[in-house]
């Protein structure tokens, strides 16, 4: 819960003064919140155009800019205004500024948005400045701003009042600008690689494509219970069956009614794609090319810092089969273990607390999570997953207990998950029925078999590689963000009263 003292500091007697000024402004100038204002350039464009202007030089160029007032000195003689691109200094003086504009100065507070027209100059100290001839009030702010150089120190308040966080925290602002660049970069990379972007339903009458608890709602007209999707997988595969394209992808939100942590948000962004006539090794190459391109676009190099670690997105990444990784970490050779009972016994003998009904594959995956995940700091592909936990992947030739699946890890986080996709309709049905029975045994009575998907697979899906990438976690790494809530503009949070 946010500190009430911190929040109360944003509401003081200053609000009364601002309200009084607003009343006076309405009387004096009429519309304090005009519908339109024409500026001739942004602050960044201004800075770029006059980058070579020497100190103590005044031009004859008249420009019009707009922005929020971040600082005011000498009774408004000097003001810094910021737009989304940067800041510019405004100078007001009786020798250059009209009487009407100077009369407005006492009514301007930190946080107000103003428009300024004037002549460009650079001061003796080298500060690019506009000598204000005309000043217009565009938005009167009724609340004081947090102090620019300290921002919001209360973390929960930063998430709840993200507008103030970005307004006063350059790191936060840059991170969300980079997020936009990364998402655009993913889309551009996929399109340049020949993938077609599609949009699949967010509301689904049958949820599937992953094992997770869904959010449930109800469609009144259709008289139908529906679910926010937990994954787009089944619809994207149906698109592949259709022949619309051989390479399909989607960037969109998934929803899972589960826990919240520094790496989990109930609403999160995924990039999921399917590539006909490819397999999981092709998807590994795709991941490496994509990650390298994104690192270069953000950092100009494939190496970058995350916390105290130096990470490299330069391919090829390390590739290790899960049974080999577990054997190296624990000495347990799962490939020589024949039965579920033997697997549970071996795990218990090594000190792992496993459930009495766990299968060979569940024991292998659990020990991997306990002993290996935390060691995967540099980007790595973990391959050869147990079939028990991978219902949509093809078997590894010669080892029917394992499938052609990999997960990409970095900083001990799972970033991506990919398969050589199962397209045998009889085997697909058998595995989905088995998965459904397991879900019902866990008490998930609403889980249903997606017959429309199975009908599409019966029609014939080409061999394909499939991949899902957690976009938020990837952005965390690329922007050095310690929490997923630092890269989601408005993350899930408790109500203020809680």
UniProtKB/Swiss-Prot annotation:
GO terms for cellular component: cytosol. Mg(2+) 1 binds at residues 407, 414. The keyword ATP-binding applies. Its cofactor is Mg(2+). GO terms for biological process: lysyl-tRNA aminoacylation. Keywords: Aminoacyl-tRNA synthetase, ATP-binding, Cytoplasm, Ligase, Magnesium, Metal-binding, Nucleotide-binding, Protein biosynthesis. It is an enzyme of class 6 (ligase). Binds 3 Mg(2+) ions per subunit. Its EC number is 6.1.1.6. It is found in: Cytoplasm. GO terms for molecular function: ATP binding; lysine-tRNA ligase activity; magnesium ion binding; tRNA binding. It catalyses: tRNA(Lys) + L-lysine + ATP = L-lysyl-tRNA(Lys) + AMP + diphosphate. Mg(2+) 2 binds at residue 414. PROSITE patterns: AA_TRNA_LIGASE_II. It comes from the Bacteria. CDD domains: LysRS_core, LysRS_N. The keyword Protein biosynthesis applies. Homodimer. PANTHER family: LYSINE--TRNA LIGASE, CHLOROPLASTIC_MITOCHONDRIAL, LYSYL-TRNA SYNTHETASE. Belongs to the class-II aminoacyl-tRNA synthetase family. HAMAP family: Lys_tRNA_synth_class2 (MF_00252). This is Lysine--tRNA ligase. It comes from Rhizobium etli (strain CIAT 652).
């Amino acid at each position: 819960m946010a500190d009430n003292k911190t929040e109360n500091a944003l509401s003081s007697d200053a609000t009364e003064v601002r309200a009084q000024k607003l009343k006076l402004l309405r009387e004096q100038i009429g519309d304090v919140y005009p519908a339109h204002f024409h500026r001739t350039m942004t602050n960044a464009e201004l800075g770029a155009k006059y980058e070579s202007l020497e100190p103590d030089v005044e031009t004859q160029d008249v420009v019009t800019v707009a922005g929020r007032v971040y600082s005011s000195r000498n009774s408004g003689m000097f003001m810094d205004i910021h737009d989304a691109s940067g800041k510019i200094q405004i100078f007001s003086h009786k020798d250059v500024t009209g009487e009407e504009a100077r009369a407005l100065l006492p009514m301007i507070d930190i946080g107000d948005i103003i428009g300024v027209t004037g002549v460009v100059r650079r001061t003796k100290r080298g500060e690019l400045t506009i000598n204000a001839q005309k000043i217009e009030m565009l938005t009167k702010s009724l609340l004081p701003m947090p102090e620019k150089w300290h921002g919001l120190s209360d973390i929960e308040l930063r998430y709840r009042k993200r507008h103030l966080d970005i307004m006063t925290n350059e790191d936060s602002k840059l991170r969300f600008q980079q997020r936009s660049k990364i998402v655009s970069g993913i889309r551009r990379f996929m399109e340049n690689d020949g993938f077609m972007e599609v949009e699949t339903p967010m509301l689904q009458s049958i949820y599937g494509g992953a094992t997770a608890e869904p959010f449930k709602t109800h469609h009144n007209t259709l008289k139908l219970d529906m679910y926010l999707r937990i994954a787009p997988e089944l619809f994207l595969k149906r698109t592949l069956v259709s022949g619309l394209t051989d390479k399909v992808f989607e960037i969109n939100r998934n929803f899972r009614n589960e826990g919240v942590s520094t790496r989990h948000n109930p609403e999160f962004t995924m990039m999921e794609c399917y590539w006909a006539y490819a397999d999981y090794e092709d998807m590994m190459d795709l991941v490496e090319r994509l990650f390298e391109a994104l690192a270069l676009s953000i950092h100009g190099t494939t190496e970058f810092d995350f916390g105290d670690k130096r990470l490299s997105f330069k391919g090829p990444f390390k590739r290790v089969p899960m049974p080999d990784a577990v054997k190296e970490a624990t000495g347990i050779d799962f490939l020589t273990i024949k039965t579920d009972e033997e697997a549970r016994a071996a795990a218990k003998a090594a000190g792992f607390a496993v459930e009495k009904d766990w299968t060979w594959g569940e024991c292998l995956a659990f020990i991997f999570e306990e002993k290996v995940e935390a060691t995967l700091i540099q980007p790595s592909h973990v391959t050869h997953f147990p079939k028990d936990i991978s219902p949509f992947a093809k078997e590894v030739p010669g080892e029917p207990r394992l499938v052609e699946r990999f997960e990409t890890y970095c900083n001990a986080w799972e970033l991506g998950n990919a398969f050589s996709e199962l397209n045998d309709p009889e085997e697909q049905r058998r595995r989905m029925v088995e998965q459904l029975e397991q879900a019902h045994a866990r008490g998930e009575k609403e889980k249903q078999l997606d017959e429309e998907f199975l009908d599409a697979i019966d029609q014939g899906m080409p061999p394909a590689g499939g991949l899902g990438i957690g976009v938020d976690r990837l952005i965390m790494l690329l922007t050095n963000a310690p929490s997923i809530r630092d890269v989601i503009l408005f993350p899930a949070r408790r109500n203020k009263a809680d």
